[in-house]
UniProtKB/Swiss-Prot annotation:
This is Flavin-dependent thymidylate synthase. Its cofactor is FAD. The keyword Transferase applies. Binds 4 FAD per tetramer. Each FAD binding site is formed by three monomers. It comes from Streptomyces avermitilis (strain ATCC 31267 / DSM 46492 / JCM 5070 / NBRC 14893 / NCIMB 12804 / NRRL 8165 / MA-4680). InterPro entries: Thymidylate_synthase_ThyX (IPR003669), Thymidylate_synthase_ThyX_sf (IPR036098).
């Protein structure tokens, strides 16, 4: 049986994203004991008690020569709230990632929608594979905001109308746009996160240029900031070696 929809839900609009580190087991020392078991066997356990700063050269060597598996023995879980179109891109990253997302079958979806902020460049110039984004005019910004908000309101009214008529949530949700906010938990390790950051952020130190959509880059930047605090030596080696995942 479908629940009666709440009458007081009014659409709200956001131009930001939420990223929170909710759980972690991640430190530079994790890289060291994982790497040293190759040559030290059981004695690699001694790395658990040592200051990883003394072995930052090893971390840099592993990153530079792309010995990747030692960077997998750690874990970070993030809570993320972002538009559905961001999650469409995010979940293309499958190796080293686990996801659980809010369900539109099991709960009534809240009317929170994405509208680009003033800093979001709106106009694409150039051809596929060679283009840039430039600032939109004031008229384009106003048009984008107005049309998006009107469209979101109409879509959510249709969703509510179907729910009120007894239509199942899993059917009614079909009218909702990809600008609707969803939420999920995403768990990764440092290696899988570095691969994500190499593709989904732009950075002056990157050997291989990437051209991510700005909204997923916003998520990536927040995740990167949290990871940098947990594994500063690994993070420094990542940047020093061109932001290419090992």
């Amino acid at each position: 049986m479908t629940d009666t929809p709440a009458d007081d839900l009014k659409p709200s609009f956001r131009s930001d994203v939420t990223v929170e580190l909710v759980k972690h087991s991640a430190a530079d020392s994790d890289v060291l004991w994982a790497a040293r078991v190759s040559t030290a066997g059981e004695q690699s356990l001694d790395e658990l008690k040592k200051d990883p700063e003394r072995s930052k050269g090893l971390i840099n060597y592993l990153m530079r020569d792309r010995h990747g598996s030692p960077f997998e023995h750690n874990s970070m879980t993030f809570f993320i709230s972002a538009p559905i179109f961001v999650f469409r891109e995010f979940m293309r990253h499958r190796v080293g990632w686990s996801y659980n997302e809010e369900s539109g079958r099991y709960r009534e979806l809240e009317p929170v929608f994405y509208v680009p902020g003033e800093s979001r460049k709106l106009v694409q110039e150039g051809r596929p594979g060679k283009y840039v984004f430039v600032e939109g005019t004031q008229a384009q910004q106003e048009l984008t905001g107005r049309v998006m908000e009107d469209s979101y309101r109409q879509a959510y009214e249709a969703y509510q109308e179907m729910l009120a008529a007894g239509v199942a949530r899993e059917v009614a949700r079909a009218v909702l746009p990809v600008g609707l906010f969803s939420s999920m938990y995403a768990t990764c390790n440092a290696r899988s996160l570095m691969h994500f950051l190499g593709l989904r952020t732009q950075h002056e130190l990157a050997k291989v240029p990437s051209f991510p959509q700005r909204e997923i880059e916003m998520v990536g930047e927040k995740m990167e900031a949290e990871w940098a605090k947990l594994m500063p030596l690994t993070y420094a080696a990542f940047n020093t070696n061109g932001r290419v995942a090992p």
